[in-house]
Amino acid sequence: MSNIYANSYLIVFVFLCLGVLLPIGALTIGRWLRPNVPDEAKATTYESGNIPFHDSRIQFQVRYYLFALLFVIFDVETVFLYPWAVVYDQLGLFALVEMIIFIVLLAIGLIYAWKKKVLRWM
């Protein structure tokens, strides 16, 4: 019986090794075979054929990332709330209590973000 489990893990290990080694091998072979001709024009930013005036990289302030992260968190909340609301009648009291706990935890996170003034745009 343990031989069956060992064979199962062996197959998973083989696929894991293949999944890691094949992309690494393909990238390595591609690096060896491609022509490498560095040029200043290749390193510049492409702006519709125009010569760029300055560096195209713009640094965003951290608060924009926090705002986007909060948006993603509450967007995922709606993904969980919608199916629950659709089948609310069939789930019963246990699912209602679980969803209330979920909403309370997210509300605590929202209140914390509000107190830390993450939601203040300017």
Curated annotation (Swiss-Prot):
InterPro entries xrefs = NAD(P)H_OxRDtase_bac/plastid, NADH_UbQ/plastoQ_OxRdtase_su3, NDAH_ubi_oxred_su3_sf
Q: Quote the EC number.
A: 7.1.1.-
The subcellular localization recorded is: Cell membrane
Q: What GO molecular function annotations does the UniProt record carry, in alphabetical order?
A: NADH dehydrogenase (ubiquinone) activity; NADH:ubiquinone reductase (non-electrogenic) activity; quinone binding
The record's keywords, sorted A to Z, are: Cell membrane, Membrane, NAD, Quinone, Translocase, Transmembrane, Transmembrane helix, Transport
UniProt keyword annotation of NAD present? yes
> According to the lineage, what is the superkingdom?
Bacteria
GO cellular component terms? NADH dehydrogenase complex; plasma membrane
Tell me what reaction this enzyme catalyses: a quinone + NADH + 5 H(+)(in) = a quinol + NAD(+) + 4 H(+)(out)
Quaternary data: NDH-1 is composed of 14 different subunits. Subunits NuoA, H, J, K, L, M, N constitute the membrane sector of the complex.
For this chain, the family text in UniProt reads:
Belongs to the complex I subunit 3 family.
The protein's matches in NCBIfam families, at most eight in alphabetical order, are given as: PRK07756.1
The function of this protein is: NDH-1 shuttles electrons from NADH, via FMN and iron-sulfur (Fe-S) centers, to quinones in the respiratory chain. The immediate electron acceptor for the enzyme in this species is believed to be a menaquinone. Couples the redox reaction to proton translocation (for every two electrons transferred, four hydrogen ions are translocated across the cytoplasmic membrane), and thus conserves the redox energy in a proton gradient.
Recorded protein name is: NADH-quinone oxidoreductase subunit A
Q: Tell me what organism the protein belongs to.
A: Geobacillus thermodenitrificans (strain NG80-2)
